[in-house]
């Protein structure tokens, strides 16, 4: 896989200087067209052998192009803030928006490679990391990102010659770093595992480009031309090709009986039983959150449901048991301009809680397979692939010790109508009823189908859905609290 990058490529000075003039002009033009169209972001991953010119090439790209439209990100040791969250969080929060370019040093490939080379992880863990990287990149590209992956290469002989030359040169010996010497010691293992990573993750939508790094002029021109040709091709394509679904469209149940039809919405708690059970579950929650075992966890609660199903009231009964410093409520509405410039999961990743914290999502990433599906805000291919992307997202949260609980609060049409009318009559509740609520009511059956599909495809052992019978608000509130408490206790038992 690296043979063509060990043959001794070189470019003479005159050829280089002539080519650079045209290349710089074309790159700048493409960069400003990217900004003008603002249809997709560009993500450049920098990997390969230490000393093969990675830093020098990126520095040159910043000189050739407008650095105001480029964000260079270096992922070295995780910060304390990053260590408190799943590993992917640090990458998600630094993704470039549409129209801009992000250059990632020390990205997900660097971390998995060094971890395996240094023996911190086993073969199976490396394979898991490779699979996760491939899924992440597939999603980024499906969301429109243009991804370039560069491997800067030197043969073992070229690396040793470079180290010796720099060591003897008083003016340039400062360029040597401990990583350069370390690379020389582990070269064979690094290249072995590097080849494995490239072989497994070079795809048509995100191929690897192996660049020989010995000659700086050849290296710079090669990278510049790859970027230019890729950018020009993407900019000239008015609509990026989207992956088409391979399965038949989802259909309604043949007997017209859906998952929500199986709920007993007549379940009820009288006032005295409600007060007693509510107080008991709130006290239980307060104790579980204060337990020292919660230091290894955080909590994410997702609230979805029919309009007027009582999500707000249920959330308030949960937070009544907590210190305001422990929780954060994230209300989800239509995405902002900033959020539309990113993959749809970006605005949820940025709110993932640190350890010992509790985040409540009032509406969530499930909008992709509910309102966006029903209103046609995204293509069928997009919401069909979202089921797998959401499962992957929640699995990453769970693997890091985040307890994920998900609620669908269900009411019948008659109860919803009664609550709508009550809201219209009550001045301090009138703000809760909108034209959108009435439009959603007209699409009741479509939501029934969408909710059934959502639960069937995303209710997993690590993040199951809880369907809450919410015609009676008291019953619903207690069930929500009890479910959260049961989930925390189950997580504590697994810790043992």
Curated annotation (Swiss-Prot):
Gene3D superfamilies: P-loop containing nucleotide triphosphate hydrolases. It catalyses: [phosphate](n) + ADP = [phosphate](n+1) + AMP. Changing residue 408 to A: Almost loss of activity. Optimum pH is 8.0-9.5. InterPro entries: P-loop_NTPase, PolyP_AMP_Tfrase, PPK2-related. Has low activity with Co(2+) or Ni(2+). Uses inorganic polyphosphate (polyP) as a donor to convert AMP to ADP. Can also convert GMP to GDP, with lower efficiency. Cannot dephosphorylate ADP in the presence of polyP. Homodimer. This is Polyphosphate:AMP phosphotransferase.
């Amino acid at each position: 896989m690296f043979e063509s990058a060990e043959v001794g490529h070189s470019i003479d000075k005159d050829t280089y200087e002539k080519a650079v003039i045209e290349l710089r002009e074309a790159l700048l033009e493409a960069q400003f067209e990217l900004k003008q169209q603002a249809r997709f972001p560009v993500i450049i991953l920098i990997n390969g052998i230490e000393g093969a010119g990675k830093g020098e090439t990126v520095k040159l790209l910043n000189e050739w192009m407008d650095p105001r439209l480029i964000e260079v990100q270096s992922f070295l040791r995780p910060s304390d803030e990053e260590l408190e969250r799943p590993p992917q969080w640090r990458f998600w929060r630094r993704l470039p928006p549409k129209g801009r370019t992000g250059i990632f040093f020390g990205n997900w490939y660097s971390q998995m490679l060094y971890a395996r080379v240094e023996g911190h992880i086993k073969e199976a863990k490396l394979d898991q990391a490779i699979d996760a990287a491939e899924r992440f990149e597939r999603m980024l590209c499906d969301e429109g990102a243009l991804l370039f992956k560069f491997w800067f290469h030197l043969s073992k002989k070229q690396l040793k010659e470079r180290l010796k030359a720099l060591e003897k040169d008083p003016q340039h010996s400062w360029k040597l770093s401990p990583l350069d010497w370390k690379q020389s010691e582990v070269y064979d293992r690094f290249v072995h595992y590097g080849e494995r990573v490239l072989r497994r993750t070079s795809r048509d939508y995100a191929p690897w480009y192996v660049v020989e790094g010995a000659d700086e002029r050849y290296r710079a021109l090669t990278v510049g031309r790859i970027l230019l040709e890729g950018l020009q091709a993407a900019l000239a394509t008015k609509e990026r090709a989207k992956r088409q679904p391979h399965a038949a469209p989802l259909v309604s149940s043949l007997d017209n009986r859906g998952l929500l039809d199986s709920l007993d919405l007549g379940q009820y708690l009288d006032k005295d039983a409600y007060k007693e059970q509510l107080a008991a579950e709130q006290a239980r929650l307060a104790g579980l959150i204060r337990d020292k075992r919660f230091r290894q966890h955080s909590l994410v609660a997702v609230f979805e449901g029919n309009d007027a199903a009582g999500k707000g009231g249920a959330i308030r009964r949960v937070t009544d048991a907590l210190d305001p410093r422990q929780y954060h409520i994230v209300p989800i509405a239509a995405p902002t301009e900033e959020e539309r410039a990113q993959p749809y999961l970006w605005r949820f990743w940025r709110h993932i809680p640190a350890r010992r914290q509790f985040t409540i999502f009032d509406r969530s990433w499930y909008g992709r397979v509910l309102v966006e599906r029903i209103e046609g805000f995204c293509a069928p291919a997009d919401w069909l692939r979202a089921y797998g992307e959401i499962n992957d997202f929640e699995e990453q949260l769970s693997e890091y010790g985040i307890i994920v609980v998900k609620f669908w609060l269900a009411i019948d049409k008659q109860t919803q109508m009664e609550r709508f009318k009550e809201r219209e009559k009550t001045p301090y509740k009138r703000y809760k009823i909108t034209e959108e609520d009435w439009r959603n009511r007209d699409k009741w059956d479509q939501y029934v189908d969408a909710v059934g599909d959502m639960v069937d495809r995303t209710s997993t052992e690590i993040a199951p859905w809880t369907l809450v019978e919410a015609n009676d608000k008291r019953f619903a509130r207690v069930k929500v609290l009890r479910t959260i408490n049961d989930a925390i206790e189950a997580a504590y038992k697994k810790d043992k």
